[in-house]
A protein has these predicted regions:
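Glycine/tyrosine- and acidic-biased, solvent-exposed loop/turn segments at the edges of beta-strands
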Residues: 16-188
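Short, Lys/Arg-enriched, disordered terminal segments
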Residues: 1-5, 188
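Sec-dependent N-terminal signal peptides
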Residues: 4-14
Length: 188
């Protein structure tokens, strides 16, 4: 019984340290790793940011051995989802979703070794570095407006699908951010 109690106590202490939660402003970036304050040990735990306006948590990042690793969350000051995704080795990896302030989804797609998402006041720019695979975009009302593939190098591949104002699917080639060969398709 005594031995089981000691093991349980040691397990509780070890998991307690592993789940350290600190304000993101207390982390220091040096030598390509994140550290808590003046510690020489790379940070393992959860860092969060709080809205000065509402007091709500607006960002949460998991770290292992000084690298962002695992789930990443970001919320608008009112608590609505803003961004969620996953980090691996400190880089954006796997499926990410970005949301408008009204809670409707803006876009969803995947990353392979993306450099990372920096919190912003708005969703002005979706990080392009490391973008890969199928990406889908919606407008503020929740209507799908664009869908297509990126190569592993982040280059748009093939024809993209666009939805016109009437909701009809059109195929076309994107010329630039605002121009398409299919002129009746609309851009998000």
């Amino acid at each position: 019984m005594f031995r089981r109690t000691i093991l349980l106590l040691l397990f509780s202490l070890s998991t307690g340290f592993a789940s350290l939660k600190v304000p993101a402003t207390d982390l220091v970036f040096r030598d390509r790793l994140w550290f808590y304050g003046q510690s020489d040990v790379p940070f393992t735990g959860v860092a969060f940011s709080i809205s000065k306006e509402t007091g709500n948590i607006i960002q949460q990042t998991n770290y292992i051995d000084g690298l962002a690793w695992g789930k990443y969350y970001e919320w608008w000051p009112d608590g609505a989802k803003k961004v969620n995704g996953t980090y691996r080795y400190g880089l954006m990896f796997g499926r990410w979703k970005f949301f408008f302030e009204n809670g409707k989804i803006l876009c969803a797609g995947s990353y392979m070794s993306g450099k990372g998402h920096k919190p912003t006041k708005g969703i002005d720019e979706i990080p392009q570095d490391g973008i890969s695979g199928l990406w889908t975009y919606w407008d503020k009302e929740g209507r799908k407006v664009e869908e297509g593939y990126y190569t592993k190098n982040g280059i748009e591949k093939g024809n993209w699908a666009f939805w016109d104002i009437d909701g009809k699917k059109r195929l076309g080639i994107k010329i630039d951010h605002e121009t398409f060969k299919n002129s009746i398709a609309r851009k998000h």
